[in-house]
């Protein structure tokens, strides 16, 4: 059996009870070393998937399964959001290896807690958009930032803080320039940091803070007073 476990946003206490039990009892653990807090995996035998190909990951899973043992594939946050698990699940189906997915606390939820904000407010917005800028992974034309911004809903942008100036400029095509923005770096980790501003000045503030990755960009009037 292979379990895909969402490890939460970073704080080891955000790992679910079920996820902790599976990790504690696993024979083999595969995780991305740069993304998952090592404290989650104390006293475990692990493979760091950061330098492994999909084929290498599957080979470890096959070997463990052949021995009648259990593999836990640990993903940061929740595996269903930018977790790239579909190709692994499809491959396991072809190999006849049973699997299940255990949800985790996503970084966008930890970010809301860190900011002590609510994404959905009466008379402000009842919609939350989770998205990312296009890069190595393309984005459908209908889901480009300029199109999504037209809703002027709460928007949470993953994997894009390294292009914050371009991001803010593109959002200003639909959001007012004074729309509040908060960038949350490593939500729930000890080094967590929050940078606030507007679509006009957030890029300068984020660059001054030296934040280039591992941060969420949150946009919308939910951040207002």
Name every feature range the model reports, one short phrase each.
Residues 18-22, 41, 88-91, 117-118, ...:
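Short, solvent-exposed amphipathic alpha-helical segments in soluble enzyme
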Residues 15-17, 110-113, 167:
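Short hydrophobic alpha-helical segments that form membrane-spanning helices or hydrophobic packing faces
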Residues 2, 66-71, 127, 135, ...:
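A contiguous loop/helix-start segment that scaffolds small-molecule binding in enzyme catalytic cores
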Residues 37-38, 108, 164-165:
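Short, well-ordered alpha-helical microsegments
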Residues 78-81, 86-151, 193-196:
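Class I SAM-dependent methyltransferase SAM-binding "motif I" and its flanking Rossmann-like core
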Residues 12, 21-22, 53-56, 112, ...:
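A broad, structure-centric signal for solvent-exposed, well-ordered loop/edge residues
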Residues 1-105, 202-203, 215:
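Class I S-adenosyl-L-methionine
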